[in-house]
């Protein structure tokens, strides 16, 4: 069974972008932890990062289809900067029926204060 881990815009900069806010853990470190945890649970994981909203939507659509076919459990998604602005991502998640857990590295609403 598969799980998608989806990272939004600028998360490729983890580890060196504002380390006082986001820490020094890199995106590669996060993906390695996800892969190791998935393996322990007997799951497959695909980690994908994009700075482009359309690419994120395409992944959600693809995994929505896999979920309907019984091949994917769902997704863990950090939409990054798109958290407060993307109606299209919301519609993609809602429209596909893909179970999605939204996660964040900081308290949303406070990161840009």
For each feature predicted by the language model, list its residue ranges.
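Conserved small/polar residues in nucleotide/adenosyl-binding loops
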Residues: 111-113
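Short beta->alpha junction loops
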Residues: 44-54
């Amino acid at each position: 069974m598969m799980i998608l881990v989806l990272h939004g815009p600028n998360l490729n900069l983890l580890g060196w972008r504002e380390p006082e806010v986001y820490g020094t853990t890199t995106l590669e470190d996060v993906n390695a932890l996800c892969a190791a945890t998935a393996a322990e649970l007997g799951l497959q994981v695909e980690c994908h990062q994009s700075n482009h909203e359309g690419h994120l939507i395409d992944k959600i659509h693809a995994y929505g289809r896999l979920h309907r076919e019984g091949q994917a459990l769902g997704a863990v998604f950090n939409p990054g900067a798109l958290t407060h602005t993307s109606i299209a991502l919301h519609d993609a998640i809602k429209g596909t029926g893909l179970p999605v857990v939204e996660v964040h590295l900081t308290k949303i609403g406070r990161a840009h204060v």
